[in-house]
Amino acid sequence: MVIKFLSALILLLVTTAAQAERIRDLTSVQGVRQNSLIGYGLVVGLDGTGDQTTQTPFTTQTLNNMLSQLGITVPTGTNMQLKNVAAVMVTASLPPFGRQGQTIDVVVSSMGNAKSLRGGTLLMTPLKGVDSQVYALAQGNILVGGAGASAGGSSVQVNQLNGGRITNGAVIERELPSQFGVGNTLNLQLNDEDFSMAQQIADTINRVRGYGSATALDARAIQVRVPSGNSSQVRFLADIQNMQVNVTPQDAKVVINSRTGSVVMNREVTLDSCAVAQGNLSVTVNRQANVSQPDTPFGGGQTVVTPQTQIDLRQSGGSLQSVRSSASLNNVVRALNALGATPMDLMSILQSMQSAGCLRAKLEII
């Protein structure tokens, strides 16, 4: 009897520990976020895969402006047909608390009709924020993840060649002003809105830090009273973020990607008993050109092309199949696989099942 009790207790503790997560994994601090940066620049050193300057006048204009700043004057009316230069857009994210001299990654994307950025070098490009202030300078060799080759009118390409990345390719030159440490309250934002989780996090903080330390404002935000000063708030948040809370069950959800046909569901999805009839209707149109020539060579007839079209209509399936009630994800998968439907068919089946009240989950189409 004692052994059974200890076994049940150990199982309960393991289950509880497996469901506990740190507050830092469930929330973020309001105001502590990344900021987007953007810039326009030139990539040089391409192996004949750059912009066709006759079709992208902005590339030539940018090159002339850059040469003018370097003290080189290009005669007016000069038609520079270069193939190793490309105009690009450069994007980056300025991390929270980014300091001067810190390096960040940048993404380089072709703006014109360049065939590839492989082997290119990004020239010094200022990166600006929404306030038009320069916060970083980007420059460096571009790493392109794709590969390609062409010869004799044929080409082979693997992955994308018109975009690349420069690791640590930008240096922060200006710091963003921060309001961290000002005031006596901070808001923790849940990654996913959940009233019960917000209240549970507030209760956990109040249990450790005292009643009134945290208040759940809504399903997304928890207001926390913090001491004043940067160092005090850093220590306070470090303690709070490492607190563990028991994660409540997720909302049952099915996510459908209408472009790729992929269907993803979490473990909370359940099915009620229902009957499904699913049929496939396919239409095949085949058009073939027939050449009709006159039988006699000198009869005055003409050779004409007559199109011949064949249409084939087929319908398969349509039998009524029973779907049993399923309370676990494995049983849901087995029940849906028993229908023998493709992912594209499964999207419409799940929509119909939700309309009939048989799918106990939220259906999200992206």
Curated annotation (Swiss-Prot):
Pfam families named among the record's database cross-references: FlgI (PF02119)
Entry annotated with the keyword Repeat: no
InterPro entries named in the record: Flag_FlgI
GO molecular function terms attached to this record: structural molecule activity
Signal sequence, renumbered to the chain: 1-20
Record's keyword terms, sorted: Bacterial flagellum, Periplasm, Signal
One example of a Gene Ontology biological process annotation: bacterial-type flagellum-dependent cell motility
One GO CC term, this protein: outer membrane-bounded periplasmic space
Location within or outside the cell: Periplasm; Bacterial flagellum basal body
NCBIfam families listed in its UniProt record: PRK05303.1 (NF003676)
Stated family: Belongs to the FlgI family.
Quaternary assembly: The basal body constitutes a major portion of the flagellar organelle and consists of four rings (L,P,S, and M) mounted on a central rod.
HAMAP family hit by this protein: FlgI (MF_00416)
Functional description taken from the UniProt entry: Assembles around the rod to form the L-ring and probably protects the motor/basal body from shearing forces during rotation.
Name of the molecule in the record: Flagellar P-ring protein
